[in-house]
Amino acid sequence: MSVDRVDRTGQVIGRRFRIDALIGQGAMAEVYRALDLATQVYVALKILKKSLSGDPSAKLRFSREGEVQAKLRHRNIAAVYATGITEHDEPYLVVELLRGKTLRSVLKAETRLSPRRAASYAWQALQGLAVVHESGVLHRDLKPANLMLEPSPGPIERVALIDFGFATLEGSVKLTLQGVVVGSLTYIAPERLRGELPDGRSDLYSIGVILFEMLSGAPPFRADHEMDLIEMHLDAEPPALDATLPEALRDIVDHALAKYPSERYADATAMARALEAAAQTLG
C-alpha cells in the first residue's frame, strides 16, 4: 500500500465527519464519502495526499480551493461546507457530495451534444460564474473536467462548477509559485498568455472554448506541442462551426473567442442573456 492509501474507514474527522468509504482519488487529494454526524447528511471529504504535505504550492492550492468555495453559495457552484486540519496535520475540505459525471466524461462518451443541451450547460455554468465574479474571484481553470453534471428532476442535469484550486482575486497575480501560467492551455485566454492581468472576461473565453467543443466534438485549437497551441490562441482564427448549427449559437461562440477581452461579452450575465435568447430559437 502506498503512503497515500491509508484505510480510514470509520475514522471521525474534526469530531464530526465519520468516513464511510474511499470514493475517488485525484492528483492532490483522496476523496471519501463521510457522514456528517451533526446533520446525518452524507458529504464528500477531501484530504490532501500525504505525499504532498511538504509541497508548499500544493498546500496553497488546496487551501485556496476551500477558502474561495466556502464563500460562494449558488446551485451552479459545488458547495464547500467546512475546512480543517486532521489530528495528523492533514488539510481537509468538506464538500457537497456530487453523484453525477464531469462534462469531460460525457464528451468522451458522446463526442458532441445537441445545441439545446450545450446551450443549457453553458448557461448554467455562466450563472455560477456570475456569482464567482461578483465576489471578486476568477476561476482560471474552466474546462470540461471542472464542470459536474448532477442528476436533476428536469430533462437537463444541473451543472456545478468545481475545483477552485487555481482561483484568485481579480487583479491579483497571474502566475503560480513556479512562475508559469496556470490553467489548462486548451482553454486558456490569449491575454493570459500575453502576460496581462486577467479579468472575468478571461473565464468567458474558456466558456467559449467549452461551448465550441460541445457543439463540434473538439476544442477549436489543438496541437502536439505547447508552443504551437499558445500561438494558435494568440493569433489563429477558430475554425468555423458547422453551418447547420443555429446561427445565434455560432455568433455567441465567435464573440466569446475574441482575442481581446474588450471584444467579448462584458460579463458572465451578458453572455448568459445571449444564450437565453438563442435558446428560444432552438427546437
Regions found by a protein language model. Give the residues of each.
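Protein kinase catalytic-loop region centered on the HRD/HxD motif
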Residues: 126-137
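C-terminal lobe helix-coil module of Hanks-type protein kinase domains
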Residues: 186-283
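Activation segment signature within eukaryotic-like protein kinase domains
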Residues: 121-122
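A short, aromatic-enriched beta-strand patch in the conserved N-lobe beta-sheet
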Residues: 82-84
